[in-house]
Structure formats: C-alpha cells, structure tokens
Swiss-Prot record:
Main location: cytoplasm
Lineage of producing organism: Bacteria, Bacillati, Cyanobacteriota, Cyanophyceae, Oscillatoriophycideae
Compartments in which it is found: Cytoplasm
Protein name: Arginine--tRNA ligase
Catalytic activity entry: tRNA(Arg) + L-arginine + ATP = L-arginyl-tRNA(Arg) + AMP + diphosphate
Organism: Trichodesmium erythraeum (strain IMS101)
C-alpha cells in the first residue's frame, strides 16, 4: 500500500493543476503529518508558499485547492485554519479498511520501491591489529540498520567493510615481531588481538626512536608490496587473527558484512594517479603529488591539498578512497554510495569527492552521502573512556551491558518470586543488554553526540529498548492467556475502531510505510525509533483503557487483531534496527 502522505500528494497535484494550470506541475504540495490531533491527521501548507506567485491571499488559494480536491473516499471535508493551512482528518471506516488489508499481508502491505537502486554502504571499517572500540559501535550499528531498511525496501545493497589492512604500520609490526616474538608469525593461534595491540604500541615507540628500525620497517612494506612470500604470510596471519576477533563482535551484534579492505585496491592506485595527471589536476608540493581544491584551508588560511602520492612514492588513504569510489561506481554499478563515518572524517571525504567530480568519475545519476555521526560521551560529558583514561573496548562494553541486564533481571525475578531456567536468564539478559546498547545509540539523531548511560538505556520506562520489548511481550502474554491463534484470526480480519485510544493506535499503525520512506531518504534511524516508541505508548494506553479478552464479539476479535498488528509492527521495526524480540521477559 502506498503511504497515505504519497496518495495525498498525488491528489493535491491534480487539484493544483486543475485550479491554477500547468504552471504548477511539479509543485510540492507540502503535505505533512500533524503533531497535534486538533489540526487533524495531515496538513497541506502549500497555499502560503503560492500567495506571491498567484498574487492572491492564502485562504483564497486554499479554498480553490479544496474545491478541486477529490479525497472524499477517505477523508472528511477539509478545513482551512489560520492564514491558509488545509487540515485533513481520516475517516474511521477508511482506517479500518486499511488495517484489515495490512493484517492479511505477511509484509504488512509494504510494497517494494518502484525504483530499486544499487546501494553500497561502507560501514564499521576497523583497523587490523587494533581492537574495535566504542567509536566503532556507531558506524557498525547505524550502517547495519540503514542496510536493513534499504534491503527491506527492495534496494540491492552491498554492505562493505573497508578494513584498514595496509600501510606502514604493518611494516613496523612485522619487523618488531620478527625480533621480539617470531613464533607469532608462524600461526594465528598464538596471539590474541590484545597482544597485537600491545606489540603495535611497542613497535610504534621503537619506530619513533630507532632509525635502523625505521629502515627495516620501510623495507618490510616494500617486501609486502612486491609480494615477498614470508612478508605476505606474516601479513595474512595478522589479518586473520584480527578478523576472528572482529567476527566475535559481529556475531554478537548480528552484523553481516563483506570485507573489502584497503589492500583490495592496491593494484588500482597507480592508475588513479596517472589519470589525475593526464587530466592536468596534479601539482607537486614538497615532492608530493597533490590536487589543490577551493574551500579547504588550514588555520593560517593556506590551501590544503589532497595528497595522492607521497614524496617517498607511496600512496595514502585518499588515493585508496578514490580507487574504492571508482570501483564501486564502475564495477559494482552503484548509484547511491553511503559512507558511515564519524564527523571528524567529513572534511577528508568532501575533498575526495570533490577530486572525483573534477576528474569526471561521478556520473550525474550517482548520489554520494556521508552519513556522519557524533561522539559517544561519558556521563561527565567528555569522550567515553575507561577509569584509567583508555579508549573503551567494544567487547568490554557489550559484556558489561549483558551483565547489567542480567543483574536487573535476577532482581526483578526475585521481587516477582518467579523461577526461571539458566537458559532463559542467559538469553533474556543477552537480548536485552545488546538491544539496550543498540537502541540507545540509534534513537539519537546520529549527527549529535550522546551520553552513554547503562541505567537509562536499561530502564523499563521511557524511550528504551526494554520498554519496546515489553510492549511486544505483553501481546504474547495475551496470546498465551487467551489461547489465541492470531494466524487464524487474520484470515477474516474485521476491525472496529470504537473508542478513541484504538482509533489513535489504528492511525499510527498506518504510518510505518511513510516512516520507512523517510528513513530511506534522510538516513536517520532515529525516525524509526521515534515511531516505534510512540507505537508502544499508544498501544499501552489502548491496552489500559480498552478491555481485550473480556470484550464481547466482534469487538474482542478486533482488539485482539490490533494487539497482533502492533506486535508484528514492533517486531519488524525492531528487526530493521538490528534488534531481536522476546516472547517473555
């Protein structure tokens, strides 16, 4: 089913053209959902914006629009409010019919997009030989959620993990391990990621202090680049060890990714530089090959170039990012590229994309978006750190979330005098703990910093994952208590919206498709979180004010179906956020 707001736009388009002529073809009718029910369910704000063009008063324009508008099949007669707002209220019988259609459809009557795209999403992207930290949390779960929504909408999505698996650091680390711990370069089973991080720090210190070691490290990089067997073997061991550690976290968070690290693009780098040179875009600066761009300056106001080939002949991140961009467009056929990175990288990618545009590598039909995000802060308002001032390891954060969720659950079970199996406790604690972390992040506008608080994110009240999960669990409890077979009820669904709380709930259930379209365009998962939180609130109000199991037929079945549709909508919405539901909590 097409979202109501889209249906309205189509009807208003016709009304505008009929009333004012072909000059208004393509005019945005400015239809929005209202935030206050006293203004109806939807509002058209176009009359004010047309006043100057049509040389008439907004109210007069609004009247002409209404006189040519055909929406009587599902709206009450429109009302003009204020200077020229057109307020629209849905008819209950239309809402009932729509809900009945949605209930009978497995995908909640959400049709795939009419214009599927090849979308590449670059997210997570940790560095080999370094542990994933709290900063990787945002990129990983925001990218995963956007991928899920776009896939559900029918787009062809390629999820890419652009891991940092190449560069000088490998020369340093391999050289250091050859001296300090040669056994580590024979098998990937000897070291864990924590050992690699420690060795990396030691190798960096040695590199900064010892010129001979610097030369060895640089030679090791040359050996890697030329394919020396022992160097490549050592590099592959380090990569495999890191991959195993990363996969533990990806499995825990249920993240699916295709690894395509920096090394994948190595063979393409000379060609990128040669083409930029052929196009006359390269300039030499301090021995390096650069592209100078307008609008990028340092603190002194001097132009800052994008370096694509260093003075020592090596390439850097920018060259690799250009090669990746070209490959994703030319070989993968991407028409939408989404980079999920922290806000600190926005300037770098702006430079890369500007160079690519100047080179003619970005066709007009290709959209490139930097989905940037803010910092995770501690409760002191500063960047989240451990007590010793270290960066928080992501695995430690997730483990702590699960442990805290378990403690809360065990306390609640004790208070309720409930006995549950160890398997039940372990499963609920893991789902609630991980869901709380994901939802606390995704429910924030990704562009903002947010304060990380276990107490807030694990609360059973408020805009939290446990609150949403509990609303789902509540419906499952109704099903068990009344021995209800929802699948059977759905076949002959008949909805009756008798009382205000069920009417409000019914209207909200119709808006999922509209919200998913907004997420697809704006790439803001918090829009979906807001919808699901409001759904849970409206459901709880309905449940508290409208008897379900004790109602007489046919109202009883209608209300049961509203409960079922709420649960199905919550389950789908939470899945699109990367969150699993529970039958009991």
């Amino acid at each position: 089913m097409e979202p109501i707001v889209e249906q309205l736009k189509s009807r208003f388009d016709k009304a505008l053209i009929t009333a004012f002529g072909q000059d208004l073809v393509g005019t945005d009718p400015m239809i929005v959902s209202t935030t206050n029910p006293k203004f109806g369910d939807y509002q058209c704000n176009v009359a004010m914006s047309l006043a100057k063009k049509l040389k008439d008063k907004p109210k007069a324009i609004a009247t002409q629009i209404i006189n040519n508008l055909n929406i009587n099949d599902y709206f009450y007669p429109p009302e003009i409010a204020g200077p020229g707002f057109i307020n629209l209220s849905l008819k209950p019988e239309y809402i009932e019919n729509c809900l009945e259609t949605i209930i009978k459809d497995e995908k909640l009557n959400i049709s795939p997009t009419k214009n599927p795209q090849r979308v590449v999403i670059d997210f997570s992207s940790p560095n080999i030989a370094k542990e994933m930290h709290v900063g990787h949390l945002r990129s990983t779960i925001i990218g995963d959620s956007l991928a899920r929504v776009l896939e559900f909408q029918g787009h062809n999505v390629l999820r890419l993990n652009h891991v940092g698996d190449w560069g000088t650091q490998f020369g340093m680390l391999i050289s250091y391990l050859r001296e300090a711990f040669p056994e580590a370069l024979k098998t990937a089973d000897i070291l864990d990621i924590g050992d690699l991080v420690a060795f990396y720090k030691q190798s960096k210190k040695r590199f900064d202090e010892d010129q001979d070691f610097q030369e060895k490290s640089r030679q090791e990089v040359v050996n890697l680049q030329t394919g020396a067997e022992d160097s490549r073997h050592a590099w592959e061991l380090l990569c495999n060890q890191s991959r195993r550690e990363f996969q533990v976290i990806y499995d825990l968070l249920d993240i699916k990714l295709n690894e395509r690290g920096e090394s994948f693009y190595n063979s393409m780098l000379p060609g990128i530089v040669e083409e930029l040179n052929r196009l006359g875009l390269l300039e030499e600066s301090d021995g390096a090959q650069c592209v100078f761009l307008s609008g990028f300056t340092n603190k002194e106001g001097e132009d800052v170039p994008l370096i694509v080939k260093k003075s020592d002949g090596g390439y850097n991140y920018a060259t690799t990012d250009l090669a990746a961009l070209v490959h994703r467009i030319e070989k993968e056929g991407a028409t939408r590229l989404i980079y999920v990175t922290d806000a600190g990288q926005a300037n770098h990618f702006s430079q890369v994309w500007q160079v690519a545009k100047k080179a003619g590598w970005i066709p007009e039909n290709v959209e490139i978006v930097n989905v940037f995000f803010g910092l995770v802060l501690g409760e002191d308002g500063k960047k989240l750190k451990t007590r010793s001032g270290e960066t928080v390891r992501l695995i430690d954060l997730l483990d702590e979330a699960i442990n805290k969720a378990r403690n809360d659950l065990e306390k609640r079970l004790k208070d309720e005098k409930r006995l549950e199996s160890e398997e039940f406790i372990k499963n609920v604690a893991q789902v609630v703990g991980l869901s709380a972390v994901k939802y606390a992040d995704l429910s924030q506008n990704r562009k903002s910093n947010y304060v990380f608080s276990f107490d807030k994110m694990l609360a059973l009240q408020g805009n939290t994952a446990p609150y949403l999960l509990y609303a789902y669990v509540r419906v499952q409890g109704i099903s068990r208590k009344g021995e209800i077979n929802f699948e059977k009820l759905r076949k002959d669904a008949k909805i009756i919206l008798q009382d205000e709380p069920e009417l409000v709930l019914g209207k909200h259930l119709l808006k999922l498709n509209e919200v998913l379209n907004i997420v697809t365009i704006e790439l803001l998962p918090n829009r979906l979180c807001e919808y699901l939180y409001e759904l849970s609130e409206k459901f709880n109000k309905f449940f508290e004010n409208c008897p379900v199991l004790k109602s007489e037929e046919p109202l009883r079945t209608s209300r049961l179906l509203l409960c079922d549709l709420t649960a199905r909508t919550l389950k789908l919405g939470l899945y699109l956020l990367g969150i699993s539901v529970l039958e009991r909590m």
